[in-house]
Amino acid sequence: MSETSLLIPKTNSPASSENMANTNKSLTGLESLIKLLPTGTLFIYLLLNPVLTNDGECSTGNKVMSSILVALCSFSCVFSCFTDSFKGVDGSRKFGIVTKKGLWTYAEPGSVDLSKYKLRIADFVHAGFVLAVFGTLVLLDANTASCFYPRFRETQKTLVMALPPAVGVASATIFALFPSKRSGIGYAPIAEEVGAEEETKKASVSA
């Protein structure tokens, strides 16, 4: 059998059904933590992971492509922590990259002071933590476990129960010490921005 045929997922096999069940358990345990990940990145990983790992029955090609997927998603998670957004002159969200001098963006800032979006130490802390959360998700993923470290599956159930609460406590501590008001790429706007947008809409309607 060629490696090309091994890249096609076998969704009807008992092993794939078991992997799907284990993955669902992992996602349930990490439900409160995956909210910290960029939505688009998480969606792409969950969509492509079963295909690229062949539901855990990997060839060399599967391992290479799965590794590339993990690397790209990891980069996306870190990169998103160094982005932010503001309300543009047309009322829509505009994104940019945070720098030492402020927010670098292609959009017209209007009256927005981009210097207040300066790079902070908290951005690096959050980037490291978000990467750790994504790494936890990858570690507990049944397809990835079967593909790269099949012997690890014996202890995976224990980690699914123990690891998410531990990471949850760490996340609460980190975000208490380093609060963030960033609403970058892949993240929903913060409550203050949502409230301001609603007030603007109400004012325009009443006018």
Swiss-Prot record:
An annotated GO BP: membrane fusion
Principal place of residence: endoplasmic reticulum
Domain of life: Eukaryota
Cellular location(s): Endoplasmic reticulum membrane; Vacuole membrane
Tissue: Expressed in leaves, siliques and roots.
UniProt-annotated stretches for the region Disordered: 1-20
One Gene Ontology cellular component: endoplasmic reticulum membrane
Function: Involved in membrane remodeling including fission during breakdown of the endoplasmic reticulum (ER) and the tonoplast during leaf senescence and in membrane fusion during vacuole biogenesis in roots.
PANTHER family: PROTEIN DMP1, PROTEIN DMP3
Protein name: Protein DMP1
Organism name: Arabidopsis thaliana
Chain's gene name: DMP1
